Amino acid sequence: MAPKKKGKSEGLTAASPQPAKATPNWPAFTPLVPKSDLALEEVLQGQIVTIPNFWTATLCKNYVSFLSSLPLTTTPGKPKKGDAVRVNDRFQIDDPVFAERLWSQTALKSLVTEAQRKELWGGEVVGLNPNIRIYRYSKGQFFDQHYDDSNNVTLPGAPPTLARTTWTLLLYLTSPATGCIGGETVFYPYSPRKKSKDPTPEPFVVDLEAGLALLHRHGADCMLHEGREVTDGEKWVIRSDLCVKR
Ligand SMILES: O=C(O)CCC(=O)C(=O)O
Ligand SMILES: [Fe+2]
């Protein structure tokens, strides 16, 4: 979907090595809804999949209060050339243990791997990207239109697994019910060429819902998307990516 070499990138690749920092003492994933009560919903064919109630409202609330204690940094207003304008506060850490927990100690692994869907996921899914990103958007903050890149990663183990990311994972911890207004993630279906008489397709808007997990295809077939401006309250998101064997 993404026209090649056109448009901004997310600017979140591990291009600039981060100094090693102590991994946070992440709280346990409890309470959770039983796996049997959860399902993947393909809300936009081949592009966007959601899991409503992936985390409970209580777990989201506990996480927001825990994450508030982390040293978040405000992203520079002026992005590097080619990167999207992204105004939010974030915390980024390479934490393979947390990524593995988020994968295996929740319904994610079962839901994603129970049906062999190599075509959908872009290969054999082996886990989540250890590069964990926490975003906090306060009033006035947003993430401008961009495409998410696919990256090569190595999942630790004996032996390590060589993998590449194929889908973005966004786990929303806040919503209008928690006082966060705005901040929807909006996807823009492929815009036809200017001269075409076809109408421009409507954007696909994902409203914030605390505990909703959203997966969207990235890399060469990523849809143009943005995080709309937050107009009140705070939007909190946990970001990782699905990884397939390479
Ligand atoms: O915060 C959002 O709604 C979008 C985040 C995003 O697009 C990204 O992490 O690449
Ligand atoms: Fe993105």
Each language-model region and where it sits:
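Fe(II)/2-oxoglutarate oxygenase catalytic core
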Residues: M1-A213, D221-R246
